[in-house]
Amino acid sequence: MLRCLYHWHRPVLNRRWSRLCLPKQYLFTMKLQSPEFQSLFTEGLKSLTELFVKENHELRIAGGAVRDLLNGVKPQDIDFATTATPTQMKEMFQSAGIRMINNRGEKHGTITARLHEENFEITTLRIDVTTDGRHAEVEFTTDWQKDAERRDLTINSMFLGFDGTLFDYFNGYEDLKNKKVRFVGHAKQRIQEDYLRILRYFRFYGRIVDKPGDHDPETLEAIAENAKGLAGISGERIWVELKKILVGNHVNHLIHLIYDLDVAPYIGLPANASLEEFDKVSKNVDGFSPKPVTLLASLFKVQDDVTKLDLRLKIAKEEKNLGLFIVKNRKDLIKATDSSDPLKPYQDFIIDSREPDATTRVCELLKYQGEHCLLKEMQQWSIPPFPVSGHDIRKVGISSGKEIGALLQQLREQWKKSGYQMEKDELLSYIKKT
């Protein structure tokens, strides 16, 4: 059964706040009783909710987990919000003999409790007192609407009670049904509170919207006006969001938008990017689960572009190496169309590389090039062991280390030419012939 209720809310002004409380005419509520919601009630969660009821503190599911449940998806991570302060939560958990972990979140109002081998992250309701585009000074509150106001998008501003009651202050449920991504209140204001919200908008657009192209003009204008604010955001935070954009839906549309709105230079992307190459590669990799750097490499013309990206975003070493590899080899290491075995150049590269991630890199390159048949073959291919060692060569009477090294290299080339078929005896007999 679905029940909807509406409640009148009056706008509130507090001079200490950095912004005006957003006026919201109605609070929309409904009952959710889906299998995904019911599956959340583990022994740990039951114990947690019982404790909060006993201590007269409100506790609700918050943010992304609510969005997922409304979409019929069981959330992987659940954030909880409460009217209890961190001090009250600590006293409550200590009295109940419940262990608390990860105390680093306490200064932000988050306490992590461990019940029945599960961790529960619970954050006190907050209002932003001041913001600087990166961080916020917060004050605790017991007002659920005020906490909802400080969140980025309407679809992330909802709460869910444990009786299944949805609390929606800013039409998040309606936006979710209509596949609409909107900021809570004014886009410009939300963005200026934390400029990373520009990338979060793009990320959730790729996640929520069915067909690309429908954006509020006010939102795009606010992004373009405030894109330079991303220059002050740490590279690590930007990379987390950008990676999710690259592996999400509508990536072609979103990357073009990032360039059209002049966001690119502030997040480490090259000004002279090859968007035509990006368009081609985005089609090549569609449906083949590329790594984020694989698609991103199509924007880079030279390896130095990868190095500059790393300086800005502090990407992982293996990600940087993959980007350098693709930019270097996307044209040089290509299938030999006149060869009876077009996979051979790629296999030879892996054999010569002797690096543990060489096969992964080559598979990503094949995705980039759109060589889907070769990719399937490569994924089924196992690297054959080279059958000759330095010890084998010593047995035939050669003791010089330098000579042994040179012979091993010659034998490896012969073995490669044979399609990795020559066996030890054949290779050792080759030494005697030479």
Swiss-Prot record:
Superkingdom of this protein's organism: Eukaryota
Annotated positions for site May assist in discriminating ATP from CTP: 152
EC number(s) given by UniProt: 2.7.7.72
Residues involved in CTP binding: 64, 67, 151, 194, 197, 200, 203
Principal location class: mitochondrion
Transit peptide residue numbers: 1-41
Consequence when changing residue 373 to A: Abolished homodimerization and disulfide bond formation
Binding site for ATP: 64, 67, 151, 194, 197, 200, 203
Annotated Pfam families: PolyA_pol, PolyA_pol_RNAbd
CDD domains: NT_ClassII-CCAase (cd05398)
Disease: Sideroblastic anemia with B-cell immunodeficiency, periodic fevers, and developmental delay: An autosomal recessive disease characterized by severe sideroblastic anemia with onset in the neonatal period or infancy, recurrent periodic fevers without an infectious etiology, B-cell lymphopenia and hypogammaglobulinemia. Affected individuals show delayed psychomotor development with variable neurodegeneration. Additional variable features include sensorineural hearing loss, retinitis pigmentosa, nephrocalcinosis, and cardiomyopathy. Retinitis pigmentosa and erythrocytic microcytosis: An autosomal recessive disease characterized by retinitis pigmentosa, red blood cell microcytosis and anisocytosis with mild anemia.
Purpose: Nucleotidyltransferase that catalyzes the addition and repair of the essential 3'-terminal CCA sequence in tRNAs, which is necessary for the attachment of amino acids to the 3' terminus of tRNA molecules, using CTP and ATP as substrates. tRNA 3'-terminal CCA addition is required both for tRNA processing and repair. Promotes tRNA repair and recycling downstream of the ribosome-associated quality control (RQC) pathway by mediating addition of the tRNA 3'-terminal CCA following cleavage by ANKZF1 and repair by ELAC1.
Name listed for the protein in its UniProt record: CCA tRNA nucleotidyltransferase 1, mitochondrial
Protein species of origin: Homo sapiens (Human)
Lineage summary: Eukaryota, Metazoa, Chordata, Craniata, Vertebrata
